[in-house]
Amino acid sequence: MRGLEESGPRPTATPCGCVKPALETGNLLTEPVGYLESCFSAKNGTPRQPSICSYSRACLRIRKRIFNNPEHSLMGLEQFSHVWILFVFHKNGHLSCKAKVQPPRLNGAKTGVFSTRSPHRPNAIGLTLAKLEKVEGGAIYLSGIDMIHGTPVLDIKPYIAEYDSPQNVMEPLADFNLQNNQHTPNTVSQSDSKTDSCDQRQLSGCDEPQPHHSTKRKPKCPEDRTSEENYLTHSDTARIQQAFPMHREIAVDFGLESRRDQSSSVAEEQIGPYCPEKSFSEKGTDKKLERVEGAAVLQGSRAETQPMAPHCPAGRADGAPRSVVPAWVTEAPVATLEVRFTPHAEMDLGQLSSQDVGQASFKYFQSAEEAKRAIEAVLSADPRSVYRRKLCQDRLFYFTVDIAHVTCWFGDGFAEVLRIKPASEPVHMTGPVGSLVSLGS
């Protein structure tokens, strides 16, 4: 009806007409907890997703203006392997936004802004899932980031797989007995767990061969918890933490497709996520994972195992909720590029890593090989905008990572690095003056 106003509390205005900050109305005046020190100094060449370049590193120091003892605010955070970083897209250049955007991954096609990670949003807030390398005093050290130097960070939250993964968030409707109006639990009783649980998983159809799945690794899942046996060995735990630093579905759902795992990411999305049920902390203390390795028969001090059949994730059955993403996320029209270096660029990179007196050395990378792999990861994802891909194909492309200023050009299916020289312009941090960020006004 005409004249019908939106429900909700009305924002109060000052005499000058400005909206007062208030929690009730959602009009907030935020203050960054810190400013990121990143290996990327500008937007050009910065990865659009954190998983593109695992070698990208950053440091975030909590400001004493927020807490007198910043180290107190980080107490206990070192027990987590990954953290959510909530930040501001401070280099947008303008506050305006559109309902439809053209993300580079769609190569010119339009879609709704809320179905993308576009920085141009009604509230210019970004979200990154980064690997926590270490906590040192009032600072945290991160890797696998997609934020530039000087980014205002609003908040830090630990990544908890049990809460942040979409699997098992809700139970399928079939689990409810509508006749008796009683809820039937998903778990199997202890007496039947060794037989019925495995049979039911095989009948669910999860053990059918997948078209793109690698034969080197089969999907496995933790066994229904019935006892404290069948723990993973140390080598298995290390292998899983290296291959699966987070749930694959949550990674795909947030656009975190790793270039190195493209051959298996599609198959894992079709099968379902690898589902460790405990913390992904690298230390792995007090929380171990269980899995089915077949029926283990203990005889004296020796355990004989029978051949293992493929299983689907624990607690999952036909009709169970799972994470779903559009096809353009997993099968983007933008192809992965081959990256190559000219001999001159290889020589330039070697000179940057030398420890000559008076020459700057890498601040975020530990070696020239790490810098090279980071450059390869950035270029293989084609960091150019849609405009540059279509109208500036003959132009050189420049970007800076750490202290390396990279010059390259793009051809048909490849990117070639022509020159690498020390970055000339120092990166300046945003000062505390004018650091307040207004959101929701």
UniProtKB/Swiss-Prot annotation:
Pfam families: TrmO_N (PF01980). S-adenosyl-L-methionine binds at P47, R48, Q49, H90, K91, R117, L127, I148, H149, G150, T151. InterPro entries: TrmO-like_N, UPF0066_cons_site, YaeB-like, YaeB-like_sf, YaeB_N_sf. Keywords: Methyltransferase, S-adenosyl-L-methionine, Transferase, tRNA processing. Residues 179-192 have a biased composition (Polar residues). The keyword Magnesium does not apply. The keyword ATP-binding does not apply. Signal peptide: none annotated. GO terms for biological process: tRNA methylation. Its EC number is 2.1.1.-. Belongs to the tRNA methyltransferase O family. NCBIfam families: tRNA_TsaA (TIGR00104). This is tRNA (adenine(37)-N6)-methyltransferase. It comes from Homo sapiens.
